[in-house]
Amino acid sequence: LRGYGISSSQTEDYQFMHVEDLVTLMDSLHIKKAHIVGLSLGGFITADMLAYFPDRMLSAFLASGNIRKSKGPSEPMTKEEAKVRDEEIAALKKKGVEVMKKEWFEGLMKSGGSQRERMRAPLWQMIDEWDAWQPLHKEVWVVAGLDDIEELKKSHPAVPSLIVEGHSSDNKFSKKTPILEYLPNGKLKIIEDCGHMMNMERPE
């Protein structure tokens, strides 16, 4: 993804969406259709694919995330929202990025089930190596968020779709999944004794 790993960086003043980058990548590799699998932010992007590019999908697998409950590009950031973000960024800098990373890490660990310890080392490595650009800047709306709903209402894509959530005492999610209202071939699967990072806890 742009802004993560060794991909090119994001900027505050260029509007793009991750889903557009994904389709551009598919085009460059001459991939007409693909099985799209996403976890967390990847789940948000997979929901965007269902809303905007269902014709490029063979199936969808959305884990620990589907429609993000936030504004999309149809509603650009207002001056008031920008001011709030500036205050949040200043507060984070005062608090310290390392403190924020540790809190995030501990929250993800706590969300897990009985197999959570198997993810401790690799999860911390990923978080530790992340440059934290996103929380330190006014990021553009890189996922469609609630804009997805309007698109899905129009198309009701027939793409076979599986929504997957992990169930543990400290992993909260809604069993009423609004996106399924617009996916005639969509299903919800709950994985017991598992948290947000299900791919690391229970890869089998």
Predicted regions and their residues:
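Active-site loop/oxyanion-hole signature of alpha/beta-hydrolase fold enzymes
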Residues: 1-37, 204
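Active-site loop signature of alpha/beta-hydrolase-fold enzymes
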Residues: 4-7, 68, 171, 197
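Conserved catalytic-core motifs of eukaryotic protein kinase domains, centered on the activation segment
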Residues: 7-13, 71-74, 174-175
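Gly/Ala-rich beta-loop-alpha elbow adjacent to hydrolase catalytic centers
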Residues: 38-42, 46
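Flexible "cap/lid" loop of the alpha/beta hydrolase fold
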Residues: 48-52, 58-93
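Conserved alpha/beta-hydrolase catalytic His-Asp/Glu region
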Residues: 72-77, 91-155
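Conserved serine/cysteine hydrolase catalytic core
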Residues: 129-181, 187-190
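Catalytic histidine-centered segment of alpha/beta-hydrolase-like enzymes
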Residues: 194-203
